Amino acid sequence: MAPHPTLKATFAARSETATHPLTAYLFKLMDLKASNLCLSADVPTARELLYLADKIGPSIVVLKTHYDMVSGWTSHPETGTGAQLASLARKHGFLIFEDRKFGDIGHTVELQYTGGSARIIDWAHIVNVNMVPGKASVASLAQGAKRWLERYPCEVKTSVTVGTPTMDSFDDDADSRDAEPAGAVNGMGSIGVLDKPIYSNRSGDGRKGSIVSITTVTQQYESVSSPRLTKAIAEGDESLFPGIEEAPLSRGLLILAQMSSQGNFMNKEYTQASVEAAREHKDFVMGFISQETLNTEPDDAFIHMTPGCQLPPEDEDQQTNGSVGGDGQGQQYNTPHKLIGIAGSDIAIVGRGILKASDPVEEAERYRSAAWKAYTERLLR
């Protein structure tokens, strides 16, 4: 049986065919950073979480969180932990994935997602769902995200400039006023002249001429379902990762279709139901948490993220059958070569392999390099 086309397509090419705007953005980010690594930041304090996000952010494309295990988590919409993570995501170029594993009736999971003390939807680009309660939970989460997004039908970006015109500018100003009335809307935005320039040569009455400054308001209107306008680093905005626009406001869902833990109950019927639910909600479901690619139909374009990834110690790093034992608590580990190169996943999720290293930043780079190598070798196979 021929491999699915997504296994041979580059991430850049898949960004062009993705059905979800956030998936398209993520593939672009992966291609730009040469990274398909997700850090599972399972740490006990908000301070540690923010520190890791800042230090390891350059190596990853996704940061996976468990907000409810973090002491010191604050929920202020502008200065809270989620808001600070969002700022670091902009700075270093990664998406935030809250590993909430919603698993209740539809009404309950929608409230957990859009409300409560944490307001997950406000700061997490991606969440996931356990399909045990059935497809209704996926539909309810999608509805909650849609209602949340409807509060932002478009972004209005406003800039105000105040200045005194030069003599050479009067002819151009006059032409522009003749061509377009103040406050007229054109294309992406509107430019309104609040105070017209007034130049008065009062030589006739013996008084000195004067110029009244112009206040100009510029507005740009942009759909939130599309990526935001690129910030120009040259203009001094260093808060956005260079080379790519800001992530869309659209929210995305990953369905927990398979697990890496020993003895889990996610059988073939469960996995198939997960795939069917994803196909029914392509406008919200980005893909899966799985152990292999689940793209089987020609139109399937889902992204796959896989936990349980670990490398042998560096001095023992060699190609094996891909298995690297377990942790004694049910977790089973495999190498990036097996998960991405052979099983066809797209993003390796790594936690303790990085967090427990003597130098987590250096180890994150080792995992990033190994996962990317597995992807590039898959393209050539």
Swiss-Prot record:
Which SUPFAM superfamilies would you find in this protein's record? Ribulose-phoshate binding barrel (SSF51366)
> Which residue stretches belong to region Disordered?
311-333
Coiled coil stretches, renumbered: none
Task: Enumerate the UniProt keywords alphabetically.
Answer: Decarboxylase, Lyase, Pyrimidine biosynthesis
User: Could you name the active-site residues?
Assistant: K101 (proton donor)
GO annotations under biological process? 'de novo' pyrimidine nucleobase biosynthetic process; 'de novo' UMP biosynthetic process
Is Mitochondrion included in the keywords of this UniProt record? no
Gene Ontology CC terms, in alphabetical order: cytosol
The organism sits in which domain of life?
A: Eukaryota
Q: Which Gene3D superfamilies match?
A: Aldolase class I (3.20.20.70)
Name the PANTHER family on file: OROTIDINE 5'-PHOSPHATE DECARBOXYLASE
Q: This chain belongs to which protein, by name?
A: Orotidine 5'-phosphate decarboxylase
Which organism does this sequence originate in? Hypocrea jecorina (Trichoderma reesei)
The taxonomic lineage of its organism, from the top, reads: Eukaryota, Fungi, Dikarya, Ascomycota, Pezizomycotina
